Amino acid sequence: MKSIYNYDLKNLEIKLTKLGEKPFRAKQVFSWLYEKRVDSFDEMTNLSFDLREKLKENFVLNTLKLVKQQTAADETSKYLLECEDGALIETVLMKHDYGYSVCVTSQVGCAMGCKFCASGLLKAKRNLSAGELVNQIMFVQKDLDKREKRVSHIVVMGIGEPFMNYPNVMEFIACVNNDKGLNIGARHITISTCGIAPVIKRFADEMSQVNLAISLHAPNDALRSQIMPVNDMFNLEELFEALHYYQKKSNRRLTFEYILIDGVNDTLQQAKELVELVKSMNAYVNLIPYNEVEENPFRPTQPKNAAAFYDYLKRHNVQCVIRREKGSEIDAACGQLRANVEKQRSARR
Ligand code: SAH
């Protein structure tokens, strides 16, 4: 049965009307789901018994089960969740000085095959539904409710390529963004993509207030193609053409993510190429210390190289930060917890 978290307010109105209900009921149900955050239809006490029964016959609520939770000293918390079909996904909560953000998974596994990433080791299995995306936020929000805190920001930066699951990700955003629901502002939501150029343009047309982050990781086509096969589909020229289009439409500052990998993309020559590539954009560069993945040969850059790379960008007027690592002691990086649990499971089989 379909989870009711799959419906944004508009679609819930349509669905309830089809079930013979007045459209305003959808607002009441929405409020129970997202403001009062109940766990069952029986708790929706201002609805008639008949309507509650009808809801129970047609929908389920929570479809995710907690398999494992790990919390680090800095309050980063990682939830390993199991979907109804047994698929495992990871959701991460992070505390910042500006609030709490949740990093959601958009696909079970990933087909993009970036060489440095742990998610690719698991291959792509399927897209998550909009309801499974919303459910991840609700799972974490209900946990935060115990501390009377609220999810203020969302990053679609977990396992998967969100722009290969575009319609579901957009429905998810419409749902959490709704002011009758969680009311998380578009400007507090960031989608990260490895660079699916045509979808970036579509996104610019439809969701121009949502932030966009691009996983760049290399300053030229030769290197980028080596470590990110997506570059053979959409090279840097096509990617940047789409990004200029996005900036024209949205006027928003872009984020470039650049993982620093020892001896691969962390030289001063590469910093120079990176400056050339991004200097004409309204953007900042997030330099991210690479998180080691046991199964592949890449290692994090040396701190002195990271510092030199950062200084070079700064001196050439590229806005950038070296992002602090959060929760590395809990396998918080990119598919690592899930990969580790799957390894244990298959060892047991
Ligand atoms: N598919 C999307 C979102 C998921 S990956 C994208 O590519 O943007 C989220 C970010 O983590 C990406 O920038 C990705 O390149 C990066 N990443 C993957 N593996 C990593 C690792 N081992 N250490 C640090 N960052 C990693």
Give the location of each predicted region:
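Alpha-helix N-cap/helix-start and coil->helix boundary motif
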Residues: 9, 111, 196-198, 220-221, ...
